[in-house]
Amino acid sequence: MKIGVTVHKEGKLYVAADPVTGVTSQGKTCDQALKNFQEAFELWYECAEDWEKERALKGEPVATLVLDLNV
């Protein structure tokens, strides 16, 4: 299964997240965050309803953008 995962840094931790399912995990390194994410996603998948799994398969993000907003 292929899904879109974003990784960003929050303080000293890396955060990996799937915006479609809401599954999120973190780690001290990018690799650790992704490893933890895979474990969290597998646990989510075991408990997810069929319609949630179908949405996850169809829900590839179109783009991830970095915006510089003046607020």
Predicted regions, residues:
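Short aromatic-glycine-(Arg/Gly/Cys) micro-motifs in beta-strand/loop hairpins
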Residues: 3-20
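Short, charged, surface-exposed hinge/linker loops at domain edges
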Residues: 1-3, 35-71
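A detector of low-complexity, intrinsically disordered, Ser/Thr/Gly/Pro/Ala-rich segments
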Residues: 19-22, 62
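A short, exposed loop/beta-hairpin motif centered on an aromatic-Gly-Thr core
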Residues: 21-31
